[in-house]
Amino acid sequence: MITFPHRHLLGIKGLTEQDITLLLDRADEAVKISRQREKKTSSLRGLTQINLFFEASTRTQSSFELAGKRLGADVMNMSVGNSSVKKGETLIDTAMTLNAMHPDVLVVRHSSAGAAALLAQKVSCSVVNAGDGQHEHPTQALLDALTIRRAKGKLSRIIVAICGDVLHSRVARSNILLLNQMGARVRVVAPATLLPAGIEQMGAEVYRSMAEGLKDADVVMMLRLQRERMAGSFVPSVREYFHYYGLDAETLKAAKDDALVMHPGPMNRGVEIASEVADGPQSVIEQQVEMGVAVRMAVMETLLLSQDQGPRP
């Protein structure tokens, strides 16, 4: 029997160390399932999962779809491009229409911060936030944590340097919250134009130099330069950005010899990370993709099979 005190996964904020550990432990078991020849289980047989993606994301949507199917759920992907949303239907109208179909879980990605939380107030099923604007991306932080824990054996008392476009990154926010909760030391390395106000209050140490920020780091997490979210000139040029804040083999030498190199994807090779590092021996980027399916399996199973969620609205 699973005991988990939440009906939804809207963010890392609000999760305890025990909540996170439970999800990671279950994800460890899901890794074993994914590596078997027979990968499908029946734990969610008869339950329905709807993936509602208002932002394109091939890897995240595919990961959620595969996670649901491996657990035996019926999975529906809603293509927003072909939906009533394009005809003027609001987010709430769409959600209420889907809710009338009695799904068991809605997986939502939206460009507006707080969209998943808003839906959770309106529907009678569980809601999983697959990324909401610049707010949070909880399953990405969980899969990053699982990747680190499996490689390092722990999350506490390690140094994690998160580098690049922190300002526009929901991945950075969720990771800072999770890693602090689990006892890690978190650094952010970025130019002033790509740092959000109040980042120190979230529990991150701020560095403006890669050499200083990466010193003795156990994990180096690079972030994509999100030019599609930029309304102004945040960096002088891509070439200059890579010179000062890109990760290549020489820059990586500042970190520990066994430091992990991570990236949430998709990567901009030659913008924030060099191919020699992305494809090098310290890279765990492919492992992150594998852990993503396992974490999403764990989240679905935990939310839908928990005996301690409280009454539905």
Curated annotation (Swiss-Prot):
Residue numbers binding L-aspartate: 87, 170, 224
Q: Please write the reaction equations for the catalytic activity of this protein.
A: carbamoyl phosphate + L-aspartate = N-carbamoyl-L-aspartate + phosphate + H(+)
* Broad enzyme group: transferase
Which example biological process does GO assign this protein?
A: 'de novo' pyrimidine nucleobase biosynthetic process
- InterPro entries under this entry? Asp/Orn_carbamoyltranf_P-bd, Asp/Orn_carbamoylTrfase, Asp/Orn_carbamoylTrfase_sf, Asp_carbamoyltransf, Asp_carbamoyltransf_Asp/Orn-bd
This protein's GO CC annotations: cytosol
> Which residues are connected by disulfide bridges in this protein?
none
EC number, as in UniProt: 2.1.3.2
Molecular function per GO: amino acid binding; aspartate carbamoyltransferase activity
Q: Which residues are involved in binding carbamoyl phosphate?
A: 59-60, 109, 137, 140, 265-266
Keyword Transferase carried by entry: yes
Q: PROSITE patterns given for it?
A: CARBAMOYLTRANSFERASE (PS00097)
Give one Pfam family: OTCace_N
What assembly does the database describe for this protein? Heterododecamer (2C3:3R2) of six catalytic PyrB chains organized as two trimers (C3), and six regulatory PyrI chains organized as three dimers (R2).
Q: Which family does it belong to?
A: Belongs to the aspartate/ornithine carbamoyltransferase superfamily. ATCase family.
Q: What is the recorded name of this protein? A: Aspartate carbamoyltransferase catalytic subunit
The organism encoding this protein is Sinorhizobium fredii (strain NBRC 101917 / NGR234)
